[in-house]
Structures are given as C-alpha cells and as structure tokens.
Amino acid sequence: MVHVEMSPEAIATQKPYLDLGLTEAEYDRFAELIGHQPNDTEIGLASGMWSEHCAYKYSKPVLRQFWTKNERVLMGPGEGAGVIDIGEGKAVVFKAESHNHPSAVEPYEGAATGVGGIIRDIFSIGAKPVAMLDSLAFGDIEQPHTQHLVDRIVAGIGGYGNAIGIPTVGGETNFDGSYTRNPLVNAMCVGIMDKDQIQKGKAAGVGNALIYVGAKTGRDGINGASFASGDFSDEEAADRSAVQVGDPFMEKLLMDACLEITGHHQEALVGIQDMGAAGLVSSSVEMAGKANSGMVLDLDLIPQRETEMTPFEIMLSESQERMLLCVRAGFEQEVLAVFADYDLDAAIVGHVIAGHQYQLYHHGKLVCDVPVSSLTDDAPIYHQQGKMPKRLAQPAADFDPIITDPVQIWTDMMAMPTIADKSSLYKRYDAQVQTNTVVLPGSDAAVTRIRGTHRALAMTTDSKGRYLYLDPQVGAAMSVAEAARNLVASGAEPLGITDCLNFGDPTKPEAFYELAEAAKGIIAATKAFNAPVISGNVSLYNETNGEAIYPTPMIGMVGLIEDLSTITTAAFKQADDLIYLVGETHGDFNGSELQKLQTGEVTGKLFDFDLEAEKQHQHFVLKAIREHLITAAHDLSDGGLLVALAEMGFDAQLGAQINVTLPTAWGFSETQGRFLLTVAPENQAAFEALHGPAQLIGRVQAAPEFEVTTVNQHFSASLQQLQTAFEEALPCHMNQKA
C-alpha cells in the first residue's frame, strides 16, 4: 500500500490521523507544541512516537512505580536492554519484547521478526547474544486456527534463531481460550559482555555523523507501532502490510559488524540503537532526546529498496535488520570500512546539530521541523482510573474437586495442553549452537555456561494468565515467584527480570485496573527476591471485537549459578533417593489445571499466597543445592504435586513410592512456594540438619510405577501410561506423530 501525501490543511479538516491512532485532542496538542499545522510527515511521526508502543502514554504512570535498581544493576529501563553485573568483569544483558499483533495476522514473519528485533536490542548494548527464550500463549488447541498459529509461529522462531546461530534454550507454551484471536508471542534474548563496554543509544556532539546500516528501507511494517497500539476486529485481521519481513542472514552480518564496532572501534562510537518500533524516527529522535541534541537527516541518503517512497513511509517503515549509529566526526570512513567488509549497506544520513530541532530533508525540501521533545518527552501521559471487574468484586464459589478415579485424572492431567510435553515444538529449535547450553529445554530453567569461568546463567520465562484473571495483583506476584522457583530449582540465585505486560485496552477502566494491580504484585515480588525490573515492554490492546485476553504479564528472569557443579535438574537420578516435599499444601484449586479439566472454566477467588514463606523456601532450597545435598529439584506449578512427580521420573524411567497426609485431590492442588527434592540416602542426616520446611514423603524406585498413598486412597500409576499421555497429547492435536 502506497501512502498518499496530504496538505496540512487537508489533514486538519479530513483528520486522517484518527486512523493512525491519534485523537483530535492529541492533534491539537502536537500542533501547539510544534507551533504550526503539522504536515503529512510530521503527523506521521507523531502517530508513531505518541503510540502506546513508543510513548507508554497509558502505562508510564504504572511503569514508573517499578523497582528497577539494586547494587548489581548497571543499566535499567530506558535503553535497548538492561544490564546486570555478574562479577569477574562480566555483565549479563537481557530483555523481552512482544510481537503479538503481527503474529496474529502473519504468524511466521510476525514471530521471526520478533526474534530479530530482540536480538538487535542485545547487541546494540555491545553484548554478544548467547541465548533465546520465548513465551507463547495460544487458544484452544483443538481448533484448526490455533493449530495453524502454533505451527507457523514456532516455525518463525526456529527459522530465524537457527539461521542466525543463537540457541533457543527454553520457554513456555500455554493454551487458553482467551488467546484464540490474540496469541501472545514474547521473545527474550540474553547476552554476555565486558561490563566496561556498555553502549547507549544517544546522539551527542555537534557535527557528529549519523550512519545508517543494514537492510534497505521498504514499505513493510509502516506504522507498525500504531498497529501494535490498537485492538482488532475480524475485518482488520487481514492488515498484513503492517507486518515486517525478516532476513536472519542479514542480521547475522549486522550483528557481527556491530559487535566489531562496539568491541574494537569504541573511540569512533558515540551511540548505537536498533530501528525497531516506529523505525527510523524512533531510533533517531530517541538518540537525540537522550543527549538533549538537535538532529538533521537527509532522507535521499537513506538506502531504499522501493521507488518513490514518501518521507512518511521512509521514516515509519519498520523494515528489519537496520541500525543507526552516531559516529564521531573524522571516524566516519573507519566505521564505513568495517561495514563494507561485511558487505552491508551503510551511509552517512545526517548529523547532530546545535539546538533542539529535529529536521528532515527530502528532495532538497525541508519536510519536518519540530522540537525533538515534541516527539519524546512531551508525548501525552494519561492518568487513568481503574475499576475492579465484576468477576473480582463478586467471585464465584470455590471449586471443590471430586476424584473417584485418581489414575485416570492423573493421566488426563498429563495430557492437558499447558502441562503436556512441548518437545514436538521446541525440537524445531537449535538449542545447542554455540555449544554453551548445559541444561536443555524441558527442565525448570535453561542453563548456559559463561565461557572462561566456572559459572553459568540460568534463565526462564513464566506467565500465569489464569491466576491474574482471578486476582491481578496476587497472580502477578505468583508469576514472579514461579520464575524465581524455576531458577532456584536449577541452582541459581535470581538476578533480575524483564517483562512483557500483555493486557487489554487501557482506556477501559477494568483493563487498566488489571494492569495497575498486576504492577503492584510485580513490585512486591521483585523486592522480595532482590530481582529488579531492568527492561521490558508493554503490549496493550490485546483484544478482538471487545474480548480481551487474560491479563498476562510475562516474567523473564535470569539467575547466576556460582559453580557449575551445583547445576541441578528436575529428573530423578537413581533409585532409593529420598523424596522431600518443601512447603505446605492446601486445597488451592481456583484457576488450576484441575478446575480447567473438570469444568472447562476458570472461576472463583484466587487462593492465598504467602510471599514471605515463598522467599524462605527458596533460600532453603538454594542453600541445600549449594551444599551438594540435592540430586534433583523441581518446582511445583501447573497440576501440582502428582504432575511434578511424574515429570521427574520420565527421563531416567524411574518410579516412586510416596505417602502423603493429604486428600487425593490435593495431589493436584497448585499451592505456591513448593518444591520436590531428592536426596541421596547418605546425605539424609546433613539435609535434615538444615531444619528446612521439608517433609520426607517417599523414595525413588527402579520399578517404572508411581505408588501413592493419601489419607483416603492408595493407587498406582504406570510411568508408561502417564508418559504416553504426556508426550502424545500435543502431536495428536497437531495431527503429527510423536
């Protein structure tokens, strides 16, 4: 679709900006800020930069409350990614981004370019990307539309990540009806760097050059930021022109070239930023804004792959694999020579200027002349008032399960789409390229070694949309806690989080209430685990025809393993190891997998959550792991105790005998703050001497059977029966063989 330019007078009367996401009041405000009627280019820039995706105009009052700093944080929110000191002169860099809207309409390219964008965020800081993770949410797996989305989105993630040579090491995939028309595609990237080489996205120093490098600019993804800041109707779902097209081989060249610049030509570099949402306007104006500088760009110098592109199209294109650098005067040819070595298109397209204006020239004509701040700091901020949704004010009665055939229920639970084995999906990703991956997908957290040290990083992504649907604040805290449990069970101490805040339309009081309450839960939990929010993004307007997704903050968390010898996995290691349950169990079923299985619904008041107890349990487990007392550790989450027990047995084909003073149904309770641990018999005394909140409930056995005694029943389940249900569920739904 070619953009047709309009005069300032026509824009004022015909109001095309309404279709770009600006309101009449925002148009008037922008005109006042720039001192004249906006022309076609200027109104386009405002539509991108004032979108929720770029300006956070509804979410910023919430985001400002996040806890973002502790003694380890070297750089927090506001740059391409956050940076945390991990000692020995090294830092870990990580961030997550959503690509929900593009993936809904063009699943392969939407997912692939989401991966590409988050990788650029990491290497723009100067870090080498070492791992990718994802967090995916889909609708009912039995629907052909969902199966199509799953297939193409997974293919897009794998196609891009595998080609660029960065391992996809972990993630999660959830299924719930609320995501049927609005799938969630959240991608996370982790990098490692020398902590004294951090780069920032700034353009400072009058006369310094702006160098564009990477793919040529085309008409793909134009106004994608505004597209990502609106909700869907069925008619709009065909808007594929707002979706970008990715080239991972170009990205690999771009990554290697930029890392050579940041690593070996630091004296030449002032700042570097990727062209993501809102394309060239976002990267350039944000770099000027951070340095309090002015900027001039000549759009005729922008490498273009299509003819007769308008300034609006050039500036708002979201063509992928592009970066913008600010280079010191006199070093331009040195930098251009590096890019030439990688056969990359690169050009000097502008300069830093005195003052604070942002000026664009096209065919020798000044087509934009606005204050930098009009597109950055002066974007509107809205202070919304939330309203508690009726389902929270008047919750339904508690779900009280009845279990007459525990083995059948157990088998059915293992086949629930959110619980079931995802290896048929993640085996399409290369998890071992770079040869640093120590713990592969399928355990509680992925683990990748830090080359040249005896240490490793653990990483995970977690979200709990059902829990937040029943209580946004408590559910969000539970999401952070589960991420931390996953890391601790792997032997890691949590360092910090990145988030993707996936919510509905913030102009609706009920949706804004969910966002604001979720933030409170995230704040409380991140403080409890000393894991500040160092980066992230918001993805609002996840609605179709007025129906919103569950409020779903995705928590990406990274932790540090001080010694490779303490890396712990969830799989049973040997027969006769003792099995301990950490934490108390209650009848917590509202929002659980068991409720979904037996009723098909998610209702009631979310069960209680003791954040302080969770923190104590995690400290205890990490201490026991670091003292080499634990042979296997698994956090309890979806499906509860019995699901976790079965998962621990599958890898080594080992069964278990357990005896618990709980009703049978409570074996599927989802009480938080719990772990299953195994301890070798010779370490029993040392483990119990720690006096932790752990109860001996049984032992691992060589026989592939799970023998369970509860207060009201004794039953035995075949490992093979449970594993078959677990492994065949998704391939069966996807009409493929396991």
UniProtKB/Swiss-Prot annotation:
It is an enzyme of class 6 (ligase). Mg(2+) 1 binds at residues 97, 537. It is found in: Cytoplasm. GO terms for cellular component: cytoplasm. It catalyses: N(2)-formyl-N(1)-(5-phospho-beta-D-ribosyl)glycinamide + L-glutamine + ATP + H2O = 2-formamido-N(1)-(5-O-phospho-beta-D-ribosyl)acetamidine + L-glutamate + ADP + phosphate + H(+). One of its GO terms (biological process) is 'de novo' IMP biosynthetic process. Pathway: Purine metabolism; IMP biosynthesis via de novo pathway; 5-amino-1-(5-phospho-D-ribosyl)imidazole from N(2)-formyl-N(1)-(5-phospho-D-ribosyl)glycinamide: step 1/2. Coiled coil: none annotated. Its EC number is 6.3.5.3. The keyword Disulfide bond does not apply. Mg(2+) 2 binds at residues 121, 274. ATP binds at residues 56, 95, 499, 536. It comes from the Bacteria. GO terms for molecular function: ATP binding; magnesium ion binding; phosphoribosylformylglycinamidine synthase activity. InterPro entries: PRibForGlyAmidine_synth_PurL, PurL_linker, PurM-like_C_dom, PurM-like_C_sf, PurM-like_N, PurM-like_N_sf. Substrate binds at residues 98-101, 120, 244, 318-320, 539. CDD domains: PurL_repeat1, PurL_repeat2. Part of the phosphoribosylformylglycinamidine synthase complex involved in the purines biosynthetic pathway. Catalyzes the ATP-dependent conversion of formylglycinamide ribonucleotide (FGAR) and glutamine to yield formylglycinamidine ribonucleotide (FGAM) and glutamate. The FGAM synthase complex is composed of three subunits. PurQ produces an ammonia molecule by converting glutamine to glutamate. PurL transfers the ammonia molecule to FGAR to form FGAM in an ATP-dependent manner. PANTHER family: PHOSPHORIBOSYLFORMYLGLYCINAMIDINE SYNTHASE SUBUNIT PURL (PTHR43555:SF1). Monomer. Part of the FGAM synthase complex composed of 1 PurL, 1 PurQ and 2 PurS subunits. This is Phosphoribosylformylglycinamidine synthase subunit PurL. It comes from Lacticaseibacillus paracasei (strain ATCC 334 / BCRC 17002 / CCUG 31169 / CIP 107868 / KCTC 3260 / NRRL B-441). The gene is purL.
